[in-house]
């Protein structure tokens, strides 16, 4: 019923806000994250439609988006919240964060190809398969491909999930990764969801795509949850970018070792995997951990957890 839905969202929202309010506000970054989160909570009071959440990298976009979705779902009695991302690596990271705050796995359905199954018996497996077929869980974490399949594919399995999109909150993360040739079709889908299905759509990104100058633009206005503030973005400018393309891999390895004597972290972007592999072979004696996205998800998750426990 509507009352039960509202109570469920209220409980989840209260739990989430309590955890968010427990965060420290000592540093400028902490203060900026809290301001972004509070703005998301306030914006959730607005009526449904299409929203834009543009937050600097490191601004707590996942948790702020979760707060908006829960608050909006509570006020307008939405059936479910659907979190989508075009990239599996981002989806896995977001899923872990969302689970920490929802704190009830029975309310969450993850639907993507990288999922590690944890069902202990056939009954649990049957229940999960049914939820995957119907998308009737309160919180769904999935890929943008799965969402678009429901809208555009004629497969029975996709059509069976269609009703679950109605009267929901759909948060689309890293929306800038949608290929430019697909933006027009994507905008048509967003318009249909918002205008026909009663869906509140949230487009999340630090670098929003241009959806106004295409053949089928998103019908406006798209409301900004967090107004653009140059001072806010300046707080999150924590990187120093250097081009080392003229160096050999051996020179880059030496550069990295020397740089890490003065900084806490360093990211090296290579064009090819074999370059990354060779670079790691030059650095592996320096006690650097190896995380390969070519490995299965379970291995990389365990490796990351092990590394975190060592750091602690």
Regions found by a protein language model. Name each.
Residues 88-90, 262-282:
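Conserved strand-helix element at the start of the C-terminal RecA-like helicase core
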Residues 1-22:
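N-terminal accessory nucleic-acid engagement/regulatory domains that precede
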Residues 106-149:
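Inter-Walker segment of RecA-like/P-loop motor cores
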Residues 209-255:
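Interdomain hinge/linker at the junction between the two RecA-like core domains of SF2 helicases
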Residues 80-100:
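Conserved Walker A/P-loop ATP-binding site and its immediately adjacent core
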Residues 161-185:
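SF2 helicase catalytic motif II
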Residues 48-68:
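Walker A/P-loop
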Residues 299-306:
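Conserved small/polar residues in nucleotide/adenosyl-binding loops
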């Amino acid at each position: 019923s509507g009352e039960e839905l509202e109570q469920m969202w209220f409980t989840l929202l209260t739990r989430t806000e309590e955890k968010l309010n427990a965060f420290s506000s000592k540093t400028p970054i902490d203060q900026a994250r809290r301001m972004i989160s509070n703005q998301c909570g306030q914006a959730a009071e607005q009526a449904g439609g299409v929203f834009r959440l543009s937050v600097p990298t490191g601004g707590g976009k996942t948790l702020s988006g979760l707060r908006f979705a829960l608050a909006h779902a509570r006020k307008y009695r939405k059936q479910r919240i659907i979190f989508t991302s075009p990239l599996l690596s981002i989806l896995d990271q977001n899923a872990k964060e969302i689970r920490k705050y929802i704190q009830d796995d029975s309310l969450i359905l993850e639907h993507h190809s990288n999922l590690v199954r944890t069902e202990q018996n056939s009954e649990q497996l049957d229940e999960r398969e049914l939820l995957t077929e119907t998308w009737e869980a309160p919180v769904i974490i999935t890929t943008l491909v799965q969402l678009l399949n429901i809208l555009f594919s004629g497969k029975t399995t996709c059509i069976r999930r269609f009703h679950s999109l109605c009267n929901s909150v759909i948060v689309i993360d890293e929306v800038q990764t949608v290929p430019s040739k697909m933006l027009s079709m994507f905008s048509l889908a967003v318009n249909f969801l918002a205008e026909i299905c009663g869906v509140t759509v949230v487009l999340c990104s630090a670098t929003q795509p241009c959806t106004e100058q295409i053949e089928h633009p998103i019908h406006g206005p798209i409301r900004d949850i967090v107004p653009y503030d140059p001072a806010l973005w300046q707080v999150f400018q924590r990187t120093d970018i250097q081009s080392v393309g003229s160096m050999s891999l051996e020179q880059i390895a030496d550069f990295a070792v020397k740089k890490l004597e003065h900084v806490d972290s360093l990211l090296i972007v290579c064009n090819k995997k074999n370059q990354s592999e060779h670079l790691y072979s030059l650095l592996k004696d320096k006690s650097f951990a190896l995380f390969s996205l070519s490995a299965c998800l379970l291995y990389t998750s365990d490796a990351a957890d092990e590394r975190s426990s060592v750091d602690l």
